[in-house]
């Protein structure tokens, strides 16, 4: 079963994609950047941006009755691998079950943000 997932508690997609899909009980989120869904603002600094990205992932998971403890794989994108340690500090507070993860540095992220997180 394929189910489109959308919540106002996470930022709307900024392109031709969805926030997430649930497929046979598994949730696949699109990458969540640190945009505050209430006002569209982006906080400054990697710690605040990682926090907002995690909150956005959490809002999507909550919308389908799931949570961080059910996530088994994430892909994280950083604009600067120098932010790896600071990003991990925040990430570890949310993803306490330590899902499998890939984390890569990329040249640019949408809206010039410092991080993006997608989860399964």
Task: Name each region found by the language model.
Residues 2-120:
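Short, polar/acidic, helix-capping and beta-turn segments at strand->helix junctions
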